């Protein structure tokens, strides 16, 4: 049963990320959808922080949705700013996840940063969400 659930989850994720890729590569991409996925990253990180208001405030400051929107909707790709945003996001994941996953998270970061510019946003969204899924799985095992 566990194997079937895993296969269903993998198929769902593949279809979902294929839709993201198709959307981003379309003539008129739905940027609101991508922005919502970025906001979801922020919300998921905040959900892991229950009481520490200082950390919650730092996450809120680091995840500037308007800045992200500007980055992805601008016709001129700002690789330096995007790199900072990607690194900041993965730094938060590394702070909040179990240390056993640090190597795989850093590999995901490298994958994103080494992506070609036209694919970097979709790969970033996918890889961060996969890291957050791992944190969720770890937390479920603890309860």
Where on the chain are the PLM-derived regions?
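Eukaryotic N-terminal, low-complexity and coiled-coil-prone scaffolding/targeting segments
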Residues: 1-97
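Extended helix-rich, non-globular scaffold segments
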Residues: 58-143
